[in-house]
UniProtKB/Swiss-Prot annotation:
L-glutamine binds at residues 352, 380-383, 403, 470. The gene is pyrG. It comes from Klebsiella pneumoniae subsp. pneumoniae (strain ATCC 700721 / MGH 78578). Pfam families: CTP_synth_N, GATase. HAMAP family: PyrG. Residues 291-542 form the Glutamine amidotransferase type-1 domain. This is CTP synthase. UTP binds at residues 14, 187-192, 223.
């Protein structure tokens, strides 16, 4: 089987939506029966985004096999059925780390190690490995054409086009076509200069995706085609839309998938986008709306919680309601009090790290518990719910996590000190261990209690969810907390770790150590988020009586 590659680049400005465009195209090709995957190549020096600030980089998306990756991989999984792995994302830092390790081992036999060919060869090897077994691979190059950081990646894909053959490679370039209000027209010059920059590297784009706040007129697309040496039918207008799930249909309506299949000589049926049409219909025709408060510490950049926000929207689709998300800084809860949590139909506390704002989250969990407001805690959101219950119900005054207060009297949350690496070897770690790549990561099995709410929601006794944490519930202090009324609703497959807790005498209070948002999709939703949004809707109705 021959694998075909579509290399996706961006020009003029960043944040054009390369990831969404690539994922949307992949969704169309998948709907034609093709086996599709997507890769993201990030030009930063970090080995992975695991230790990067969420405020700078956005969320870290965790794959089933435990890779900490770029948030674009979340978009990929929400648009296509293929599950991402550590092969689908790598960085300049990872490439240099691998090459330098080989140099130290003597693998290069004394050769002078250079960007070309050693770095570019390493990039090509990883792209080829990630594409094995697929009909079409979309490869998104992070950054903007013209950046110094992305040059090795651009050189590598230029070489791949020559080595694999142009009949099996395509270059798709996203570019900005701005509208100038003073002139009353869109301007194509930035696109022309961006393509000129690509040409100077040796890459002639085959497809141009023209991003604009409005549809790019046919005469302007013809002008772009002429000056950029691209067929007119391969100049695609991609205007701003009110729902990203409309983009597959928008691209298909302009024949992009037909052009690609013809270019790759692929014989496959027409794309059936009925599932996406259903998503769009549900989104556009809600029967009501709810307001959910998300209390976190990175709220100045909503992308820090991208998958959670999307999962809440998916929960809304499954309940035919619009979910309005109110982002609340947990430090504001500390300074202004729980009064700012009024008028919410439900409360969610997502994952996070560090002590800043934790007391505000604990106060939020208490407010939700005492006022019978639906509550969903994720990762740290479970830990603060446990701490709150231990303090205020189980009588463990000043209970805390050793992450925040190492010598606290009641360390109800503590560091997991024994781990297993990718090869199954036992590792012992402490608070002094490296932060990068030292968490419980990836898909883990969880056994659900028969009498639990989550057992009803999932409809099965055993589930698999993705994790990203290094602190866990301290089993040594669990008995008095359970005796006070907290229910352990889920445990790890080996029965060692607490994965889900519930408050039984509460309408809907669920907190989980894993990250259910990573497996939620617009077409399928997720049991926890669907149940949570339903509980919010029911709470709203009770309050209205």
């Amino acid at each position: 089987m021959t694998t075909n590659y579509i290399f996706v680049t961006g020009g003029v400005v960043s944040s054009l939506g390369k990831g969404i465009a690539a994922a949307s195209l992949a969704a169309i090709l998948e709907a034609r029966g093709l086996n599709v995957t997507i890769m993201k190549l990030d030009p930063y020096i970090n080995v992975d985004p695991g230790t990067m600030s969420p405020i700078q980089h956005g969320e870290v998306f965790v794959t089933e096999d435990g890779a900490e990756t770029d948030l674009d991989l979340g978009h990929y999984e929400r648009f296509i059925r293929t599950k991402m792995t550590r092969r689908n994302n790598f960085t300049t830092g990872r490439i240099y780390s691998d090459v330098l390790r080989k140099e130290r081992r003597g693998d290069y036999l004394g050769a002078t190690v250079q960007v070309i060919p050693h770095i570019t060869n390493a990039i090509k090897e990883r792209v080829l490995a990630g594409g094995e077994g697929h009909d079409v691979v979309l490869v998104e190059i992070g950054g903007t054409v013209g950046d110094i950081e992305s040059l090795p990646f651009l050189e590598a894909i230029r070489q791949m086009a020559v080595e694999i053959g142009r009949e099996h490679t395509l270059f798709m370039h996203l570019t900005l076509v701005p509208y100038m209000a003073a002139a009353g027209e869109v301007k194509t010059k930035p696109t022309q200069h961006s393509v000129k920059e690509l040409l100077s590297i040796g890459i002639q784009p085959d497809i141009l995706i023209c991003r604009s706040d409005r549809a790019v007129p046919a005469n302007e697309r013809a002008k772009i085609a002429l000056f950029c040496n691209v067929p007119e039918k391969a100049v695609i207008s991609l205007k701003d839309v009110d729902s990203i799930y409309k983009i597959p249909g928008l691209l298909k309506s302009q024949g992009l998938d037909d052009y690609i299949c013809k270019r790759f000589s692929l014989t496959c049926p027409e794309a059936n986008l009925a599932e996406w049409e259903q998503v769009i219909y549900e989104e556009a025709n809600p029967a009501g709306e709810v307001t959910i408060g998300m209390v976190g510490k990175y709220i100045e950049l909503p992308d820090a919680y991208k998958s959670v926000i999307e999962a809440l929207k998916h929960g809304g689709l499954k309940n035919r309601v619009t979910v309005n998300i109110k982002l609340i800084d947990s430090q504001d809860v500390e300074t202004r009090g729980v009064e700012i949590l009024k008028d919410l139909d439900a409360i969610l506390i997502p994952g996070g790290f560090g002590y800043r704002g934790v007391e505000g989250k604990i106060a939020t969990a208490r407010y939700a518990r005492e006022n019978n407001i639906p509550y969903l805690g994720i990762c740290l959101g479970m830990q603060v719910a446990l701490i709150e219950f231990a303090r205020n119900v189980a009588g463990m005054e000043n209970a805390n996590s050793t992450e925040f207060v190492p010598d606290c009297k009641y360390p109800v949350v503590a560091l997991i000190t024994e781990w297993r690496d990718e090869d199954g070897n036992v590792e012992v770690r402490s608070e002094k261990s490296d932060l990068g790549g030292t968490m419980r990561l990836g898909a883990q099995q969880c056994q659900l209690s028969d009498d639990s709410l989550v057992r009803q929601l999932y409809g099965e006794p055993t589930i698999t969810e993705r994790h990203r944490h290094r602190y866990e519930v301290n089993n040594m202090l669990l008995k008095p907390i359970e005796a006070a009324g907290l229910r352990v609703a889920g445990r790890s497959g080996d029965d060692q770790l607490v994965e889900i807790i519930e408050v039984p005498n509460h309408p809907w209070f669920v907190a989980c150590q894993f990250h259910p948002e990573f497996t939620s999709t617009p077409r399928d939703g997720h049991p926890l988020f669907a149940g949570f949004v339903k509980a919010a809707s029911e709470y709203q109705k009770r309050q209205a009586k």
